[in-house]
Amino acid sequence: MTYTKDALKEAIQQKLRLNYGCTEKQATDGEIMKACALALRDIMAVRSVDTQERTQEQQEKRVHYMSLEFLMGRSLMKNAYNLGILPQLTQAVEELGFSAPDIFDMEPDAGLGNGGLGRLAACYLDSMTTLDIPATGYSICYELGIFKQKIVDGQQVELPDDWLNLGDAWLMPKPQEAEEIHFGGRVRTRWDNGHLMVVHEDYTRVLAIPCDMLVAGYNTDHVNTLRLWDAKSPKPIDMQLFSQGQYLKANEERAMADSISTILYPEDNHYEGKSLRLKQQYFFVSATLQSITRQHIQTYGTLKNFHEKNVIQINDTHPALVIPELMRILIDDAGLGWDEAWDITRHSVAYTNHTVLAEALESWPQRLFETLLPRIWQIMQEIARRWQQKVDNFYHDPKKTEKMAVIWDGVVHMANLCIAGGMAVNGVSALHSDILRRDVFRDACGMEPDKFRNVTNGVDHRRWISQINPGLDGLIRDCIGDGYLTHAGHLSDLDRFADDAAVLSRLEQIKGDNKQAFARWAKRQQGVTLNTDAIFNVQVKRLHEYKRQLLNVLHIISLYQQLQDDPNMDFRPQTFLFGAKAAPGYAVAKRIIRLINSLADQINSDPICRDKLQVVFLENYRVSMAEMLMPASEVSQQISTAGKEAS
């Protein structure tokens, strides 16, 4: 179906009247933005139903991509672009009396991620949808995202990121599909005719309410879903305590449940923080698996063929509890024996590793599992015992047994759990995968070499070239056509233009225009004036010592000293742009941010450096900022410690 400008305009007007009780003459920019989102959501909802019916009829294998992060950025322009109606939507908004760029800029970045882990998940979801693969992403509906970064006196201050205020237009709550999650309590077991009967009692219940975000594929009617779980207590407020004036205590259980889906990565340098993180992970995993298995049983009537019709890809170790949770469902709920359940599990789950840093490989204290997840702990113990026996029989080496253990000395090792219970382990670049085989997981690879493979990180090039850089997109189309939009390999055809003076001149003009556009954005958003005649030298990524922002700072200090020693030296002007968030509890990273801002104050106020050297820290780096910055960048600093970066 073709959606014209007039049809979209009428749809937006209808949404304003029905949802916000106003006309375009009375509407705010925010209401127009949400009305546009709702109009597009309706288009995608129709296609989503068709996609689900087609998948159900053809009984296709489904991909379930589980990640604590999905760094989606903004969805309005992206979905309009993929649906092929961005020009029509732009015209419709303009004819309603609004500035389309201002309306698009109203949309907040979805607060569902932080770094490369989440951006990879978002790119995969876009790609799978474009390829017509039946896929669903799963995560948590974080109320306040990770945090909004504010720089005050050169230092990072964390503020709540209330993205749902405007971003909730994309979400479709489905309370009728809620799942119940159990924490704490105690477990009783008994044998009955050769079957283990498990009773979990005295637990705390939390409801997981699904909120679905639809994802449109490019140039296809296929629509996939990102299912986000919102945590709520099933217990009403304690009216007796409330009437006694004990307002906080009356709401205590509701507040504890709500905290599970409040923020991404709560600080975990104390017991309560660790407990909340583990609750988040199990809440997310249990809700997802209950939903997947329920849908599978409705279709096939059994879980015995679960692995034939489903694959669960876990993005890093945060969803690793999918392994014991699937075992719990297969054994306790479906009544399967251990061996059959383990065979199904091991052929259903695949694990993507994202780090080679030993200290970053996730682990948990045993006592947390015993307290919060008693039944999962029982299953984990049996997984660990059987895996350890397998390693012992293969290596006969106590040191290797300890290194590969799922549980050792009161600590649960999640990466080892993923290796033990998964059918595949992949790195995200050839070098990274090689390091995993030769070093990080060398012993596991020696025992099960076929399990380890490489899947090099990709990027949604339609977003990062065509959508955000229309000048470059136009040049590419003029040179090689638009086939690259669905077949990125066609970009290699540009090699033949490497020495084409006309193409290079046009490329230089496009870069200059993008730099000017970013400079205007930076002036408007952050009040900083950039020297667009200088090289834009950019380092934007999570703030971490191994990312070596500090090394970049030392290089800048060296350049500054050279200019001080010889102000008239031959010097190519450079503007160094930093963008990074530091984890709230990461003191060293925060001090590096302060150092960058102090250095910026010193250099930018020194007359010697005028029009030669500039340093700018970009506050609250996010996907929508990257969409402005990437087309303007000329040098991208990728200087992580050798052998420590996954990709």
Regions found by a protein language model. Give the residues of each.
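A conserved ligand/cofactor-binding region detector
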Residues: M1-S647
